[in-house]
Amino acid sequence: MKPSIVAKLEALQERHEEVQALLGDAGTLADQERFRALSREYAQLSDVSRCFLEWRQVQEDMETARLMLSDPEMRDMAQDELLEAKAKSEALEQELQLLLLPKDPDDERNAFVEVRAGTGGDEAALFAGDLFRMYSRYAESRRWRVEIMSASEGEHGGYKEVIAKISGEGVYGRLKFESGGHRVQRVPATESQGRIHTSACTVAVMPELPEAELPDINPADLRIDTFRSSGAGGQHVNTTDSAIRITHLPTGIVVECQDERSQHKNKAKALAVLGARIHAAEVAKRQQAEASTRRNLLGSGDRSDRNRTYNFPQGRVTDHRINLTLYRLDEVMEGKLDALIEPIIQEHQADQLAALAEQE
């Protein structure tokens, strides 16, 4: 391992011990905000510290085995121990490299997930409903909370557009690579000839930002329209102008919210989604500039990117970004997404490692 990396790991190990001591200090315990921040830092450093201490022990074991090679009686055993230690050292070095990769500060945050029907009319709206159900099931399996922020239902079911906030541990980090185009190939229920139709939906995943980090939005840049809610809601529907449409004039971003009966609550939800969308647009612009010198295999998460095809007649789902095909479509649509999410995360890590190697 390079001396520069070892030096960095030693500094992190020292910081881990320092934070551990601070957490036991009475002054820290009295300041709950500082205690929480240090607890998070301690948890983040723990894996690196454990792995580095293990790696250091393996280096000592290798040195001991090398010294034993000069003893004829111990040579065979020493060679076996040296081979075993080398293999362990390589595995630990690989793990440490992954642990040292730059972390996306948004990964641990809640996320807004937006599913929008694209080409394909009613069938696209039905598929948008299926995708939203798939993400909701996945969220349930991870004990995340799903709250619909805004929904525009399709005429024959599903959604023209649905935005939900998903809250829990590491939501954005797991779902961020879902952003992009999703295509479905299947025979619609209304199709009497049994012909396969192709429809498309787009998904956008945006981190929920704390208020302090939301982009500054000038109220003069907003056009706020109120209108009467449509859809489910019984006697309260169409009696008050509780629904809100906010247009951010500089970017043209439009957010509607009509899920709550209170105009005030709808406005608060719409502003939260608007802030996340503006932030996501700024991040995408920055990433595009950074990636212009380097081809990113995973795409930009732009609506025009084609992420996956869900082929119902063949029971197949294909992720085009990493050429992965699974014949487990029923399971995937029931929310068993880890078999698709894990390989994408691994590909992203490999891409980061390659970028680091190029920098060095």
From Swiss-Prot:
The keyword Cytoplasm belongs to this UniProt entry's keyword annotation: yes
Molecular functions per Gene Ontology: translation release factor activity, codon specific
Transmembrane segments: none
Post-translational modification (record): Methylated by PrmC. Methylation increases the termination efficiency of RF1.
InterPro entries xref list: PCRF (IPR005139), Pep_chain_release_fac_I (IPR000352), Pep_chain_release_fac_I_sf (IPR045853), Prokaryotic/Mito_RF (IPR050057), RF-1 (IPR004373)
Post-translational modification N5-methylglutamine, affected residues: Q235
Cited SUPFAM superfamilies: Release factor (SSF75620)
Region called Disordered, residue ranges: 286-313
Domain of life: Bacteria
Major subcellular location class: cytoplasm
UniProt-annotated location(s): Cytoplasm
Cellular component per GO, a single term: cytoplasm
Family as reported in the entry's similarity comment: Belongs to the prokaryotic/mitochondrial release factor family.
Role noted for this protein: Peptide chain release factor 1 directs the termination of translation in response to the peptide chain termination codons UAG and UAA.
HAMAP family: Rel_fac_1
Xref: NCBIfam families: prfA (TIGR00019), PRK00591.1 (NF001859)
Protein name (record): Peptide chain release factor 1
Taxonomic classification: Bacteria, Pseudomonadati, Pseudomonadota, Gammaproteobacteria, Enterobacterales
Gene assigned in the entry: prfA
